[in-house]
Regions:
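The beta1-alpha1 cofactor-binding region of Rossmann-like NAD(H)/NADP(H)-dependent oxidoreductases
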Residues: 52, 72-85, 119, 246-248
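Active-site helix of classical SDR
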Residues: 137, 174, 182
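Alpha-helical segment proximal to the catalytic Tyr-Lys
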Residues: 142, 146, 187-191, 262
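Short C-terminal tail/terminal secondary-structure segment
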Residues: 111, 163, 236, 240-242, ...
């Protein structure tokens, strides 16, 4: 088990009840890291489970583990807010050793064939997934370079960043871009002992699947039916026979955040149960 005692992690997009960001935050907290959890809102979105209290709940869970945790609301597509986010983390804990750039766009009007895709929907996906990740990486990398103690940057891409999928053109393009960003940053930051790697999940059973199901529902089909069908079809075509849980992604993130990954940089690890083996 990795030991992250004394390390400080910033995780974006960590406010969901069953989300990947929350799972990673708690995993790193279990391993001793102090964690800054970020989302665009403090409380859950209206359609999220009433059982979730967003960032405050994640912080309470981190504190229950005996590690430090703070919440920081910020829009990652705004450079000034991103800088304030990083500054808040450094002010509270003195440093940031690990960035997990997890925040991404919610599925919606972008889930259409290219010929029907609205320019505004395209731009929103690129702004959130690509620009937002770039701004977070830039701000944290500047801090890490200045501090000169190395660091770990983990970018959450997707298997959709390795293969095209019908009706996912905007999303695929953004996730392909993140793999390119990962590799470029890995080259640039290697002299500073900063490792930069990407995780490429397949379908993960989180609130995001609810949004995807609502966006992809066929005529005569309810979002709940579509969700069940998506989970079932994906599991049946995945060699390991199931879709991912947030913990599956968190386990890989904890490895990449630790010293055990010191000789890895610029790689994109598919965490898809064998759905994608490239």
């Amino acid at each position: 088990m990795a030991n992250l005692t004394g390390k400080v992690a910033l995780i974006t997009g960590a406010g969901g009840k069953h989300g990947v960001g929350r799972a990673i935050a708690l995993k790193l907290g279990e391993q001793g890291a102090s964690v800054i959890v970020n989302d665009i809102v403090s409380q859950p979105y209206p359609d999220r489970s009433a059982e979730s209290e967003g960032l405050p709940q994640v912080v309470r869970e981190l504190c229950a583990l005996g590690t430090g945790g703070i919440a920081a609301v910020a829009d990652i597509t705004d450079a000034a807010q991103v800088q304030e986010l990083v500054d808040k983390g450094v002010e509270e804990f003195g440093q940031i050793d690990i960035l997990v750039a997890n925040a991404g766009s919610r599925p919606g009007k972008d889930r259409l064939p290219v010929v029907d895709l609205d320019e505004e929907a395209w731009d929103l996906v690129q702004k959130t997934n690509v620009k937002g990740t770039f701004l977070c990486c830039r701000a944290v990398a500047r801090h890490m370079v200045e501090r000169d103690e190395g660091g770990k940057i983990i970018i959450i891409s997707s298997v959709a960043g390795k293969m095209g999928i019908p009706r996912y053109a905007a999303y695929c393009a953004s996730k392909f871009a993140l793999i390119g960003l990962t590799q470029s940053l890995a080259h640039e930051l290697a002299p500073n002992r900063i490792n930069v790697n990407a995780i490429c999940p397949g379908l993960v059973d989180t609130e995001r699947v609810d949004h995807m199901a609502a966006a992809l529902t066929d005529p005569g089909e309810t979002p709940e039916d579509r969700r069940t069908r998506m989970i079932g079809e994906t599991a049946s075509t995945t060699p390991l026979g199931r879709v991912a849980q947030g913990a599956d992604i968190a386990d890989v993130a904890s490895f990449l955040a630790s010293g055990e990954s010191d000789y890895l940089t610029g790689i994109s690890i598919s965490v898809s149960g064998g759905m994608w083996m490239g």
